Regions:
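Conserved hydrolase catalytic core segment
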Residues: 96-132
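Helix-rich cap/lid subdomain of alpha/beta-hydrolase
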Residues: 132-201
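Serine-hydrolase catalytic-loop signature spanning alpha/beta hydrolases and amidase-signature enzymes
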Residues: 37-45, 57
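Active-site loop/oxyanion-hole signature of alpha/beta-hydrolase fold enzymes
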Residues: 56, 62-99, 112-119
Length: 255
């Protein structure tokens, strides 16, 4: 009788250990980086989906975004804006790796992290590209006077409804119009000065590009140009999604 009990206990422990090892192998740590003017809140649909499949998830606010206490004028340098992600990546133990997911403008912060911490990133996922062109009713601030360059801009409701959220639920658009914050008006020169990428570091990280067919801020020909000139390891196209794919097609993004 005692022998049977010991055998049963041993069998149970063996099954438990095998299950635990398999579960550990299936778990990944996703780090989600939002786009301009947004915050961690824009991932509210994707976070529970990832967690329900056993993954760890960290979604946080870049400087002067979401509920980050910094004011937009407190982050005049690109490195200031990236700092929350930089500090988080620095805190990760060297033996651990994360999956970085950057949406649109957030891909710049992600690229900076890839250059500094390539050994801590298993794969980087770029979700659509950053916007350019007609910003419609986006508000521009000139805190240093009208004769000086602009200091920040805030996405307008018309711009968001027509260019970013045109296929997303109206509730998500409404949420965005209430929560977006100003973004410091960084110039191309600012990024060129502080965002220097190398093949040895940035280029050593596996990259996945996710494109959408209804993205109104970037045309398909530009998306294909990005793919040709950046050499991602994998490209995924999501049909029927606007730029805010985590809002309009969260399940497809998860897949």
């Amino acid at each position: 009788m005692e022998t049977k009990k010991v055998y049963s206990l041993f069998s149970f422990l063996l099954i438990f250990l095998v299950f635990s090892v398999n579960l550990a192998r299936s778990e990944s740590h996703f780090v989600l980086v939002h786009t301009a003017g947004h915050g961690a809140w824009c991932w509210y649909k994707l976070v529970p989906l990832l967690k329900s499949t056993g993954h760890n998830v960290t979604a946080f606010d870049l400087a002067a975004s979401g509920i980050n206490p910094k004011h937009v004028l407190d982050v005049p340098f690109v490195s200031d804006y990236f700092r929350p992600l930089t500090e988080f990546m620095a805190s990760i133990p060297r033996h651990e790796k994360v999956i970085l997911v950057g949406h649109s403008y957030g891909g710049l912060a992600m690229s900076h992290a890839m250059e500094r911490f390539p050994e801590k990133i298993s794969v980087a996922v770029f979700v659509t590209t950053r916007s350019e062109g007609d910003y419609l009713d986006t508000r521009v601030a000139y805190d240093n006077g009208p004769k000086n360059p602009p200091t920040s801009y805030t996405l307008g409701s018309k711009y968001m409804s027509e260019k970013l959220y045109q296929l997303s639920p109206i509730d998500d658009l409404t949420l965005a119009t209430m929560l977006v914050r100003p973004l410091y008006a960084y110039t191309t020169q600012d990024f060129a000065r502080e965002l220097k990428l190398s093949g040895d570091k940035y280029g050593s990280v596996s990259r996945i590009f996710i494109m959408t067919d209804k993205d109104k801020i970037r045309q398909k020909n530009f998306q294909h140009w990005m793919i040709e000139h950046n050499g991602p390891n994998k490209v995924k196209f999501i049909k029927g999604s606007d730029n805010m794919v985590m809002m309009s097609k969260p399940k497809e993004l998860l897949a």
